[in-house]
Amino acid sequence: MRGGLAVILCALVSAPLSLSGQGVNLRTRQWNDPYVAIGNKAASDYTPAAALLSPYYSYSSAAASFDLREERNGAYVPEEGDALRQGRFDAWSLLRLKGNSAVSGRVGYRRAVKRDVILNETADYRLLRPYVLIDTVGGDLQHEQYSFRGAWMRRSDRLVCSVYGSYKAVHEYRSFDPRPRNVSSDIKADFSLGYLFPHGSVIGYAGYRKYHQRQDVSFMNNTGANTTLFHYTGLGNDYFRFRSTGVFAATRYAGQGLEAGVVGTGVSGRLHYGLSYDLLEVSRHLSNQNEAPLSTLGTETLNSFASYRVSPSFAMEAAIEYERRRGDENVIDCAASGIYNSILSLRMYTQDMVNASLSGVVRVEKRYGTWHLVPSVRWMLSSEEYLYPSSWMEFSTLSGRLAGGFSTIKGLWLCDLRAGVEYSGCLYGSHSLQSGEELFRVSCIDRFERRTTGSLQCNAQALVQREIRGLLAVFSRLSLGGMFYGQGSRMLTLTVSIGISY
């Protein structure tokens, strides 16, 4: 699969630059237009076959970027550190070919340092939480990531189909005690088939996912500070029997998943809709203890969206996501036969999360440029529970956002400016935690307080691009962001990018 993706992506980079009669600045403005994105972007994220039916022109872009994140008064997500220094390269493309077909692809590379990561020794934290390996020392983590994905799409009369594949690899490590070294891989593949009606379309798709991570932790000095490692199980609890200073640190994650969904259009393309279901089961093993099976995390995700273009200047989109995490922990025997066996499995951890949003886009076109106004509202609910010792945490937030932008083309120059502000408040929140480790309980309470404290977020972005002979353009982009919450806590972000588009 990786070789096939490489062929597709090389073709994207070396493809002719004159596939579209539109200038690069015009195509860039179309791809950045939030009005055009309503419905089309969400449908294309579900399956690449939807991109073939979208109004997007052929377009390619490659950029080198530097990301900076700084936080004060602790990290909003301590497991990912309170600061980030990251260099990255991203290239992506959608190329419409002859014969009603198209190819798309994306490549990415990231090299980063996560500062002061605590209570997490495992890569892909957001995917595997809460079943990660943690320690009470923490420190900087080196992060390296490669990603590739490609798709082929074709339309034949009233039928449309696509084939898609992706691969992501992550390497994380620390150069002082405790010294985790994590290598993970995530592979996806799917196929879609759809039918076009006189005034709409419907596309169904299905896919397979395979995940793997190998984790090893070593020490140069086993008699230093607190170097105990904990197999975390959620809401302040851990697998007490397998606490260690390295004996039970080698861990292997193995997962498989399925996905299926449907997207469609109606009312001559003014209506878009989609529904998808994802399932991923990841088991965790002690790889240096006869592959003793510790736990299994099952994550189910249900997504849906609907959008409608009321007029050429106004569109709306509603989306909802439901995620359920369920953790089964195994009771392991004493290995009298030399092999650890699971004698009982218990459902110990559950979390239900709901995210619902409603947004609109108002577009006003003038001779000198185009204005956009994008208001939105979002509701979020989270409910976690641990069976024994009985613990639970739940909260709900409501946020409103107002964003706007202006873009204009003057001669060979394109300028795109955007800004937004968002306020989030807590509707309700409560918790009851019991834990043998005070540090774990305090960290859970701290996370709860950060999520339930009102926050103010703001961001601004400026893009300047110069076209060269109508076939190629060079651009620079500056993005600034900030989040302010609690008693003086804040997160500031900066991204600087330079690149080409064609």
Question: Could you say what each language-model-derived stretch is?
Answer:
Residues 66-72, 109-113, 154-158, 167-171, ...:
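Transmembrane beta-strands of outer-membrane beta-barrel pores
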Residues 83-89, 142-148, 181-189, 254-260, ...:
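Residues that define the transmembrane beta-barrel architecture of outer-membrane proteins
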Residues 72-79, 116-122, 173-181, 215-221, ...:
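Outer-membrane beta-barrel translocator domains and adjoining extracellular loop/strand segments
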Residues 56-62, 99-105, 157-161, 198-202, ...:
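Outer-envelope beta-barrel architecture signal
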